[in-house]
Amino acid sequence: MLNEPVAVVFPGQGSQKPGMAEHLVERALDLCARWMDRASAILGWDVARMCSEGGASDLRRTSVTQPAVFTVSVITWRLLHRSGLRPSFVAGHSLGEYSACLLYTSDAADDLLCVD
């Protein structure tokens, strides 16, 4: 795909906003549905609904924000990977450090959603 080194940087809490996954749904509905459903089953609440319809006050709650941002990061990573992108470097800010470590070195995204 690219001949130059590419870095992927994952965001932390504070990057959330209502409708934050809409651009991903438009590009890869199947991928979004699969990962949003997995996250929802693990967490016990509808992650897709919260990402698309949740208000700013809902998304400020850490218990909502961090799993939602992580799930969107997983979907973004999978979409980039599907398109052939293989980054040379990954990094993250705050919560994004977990995303970077886990997604770059493992396929166990479910594990991080279970951390209490």
Q: How does the language model describe each region?
A:
Residues 104-109:
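Conserved small/polar residues in nucleotide/adenosyl-binding loops
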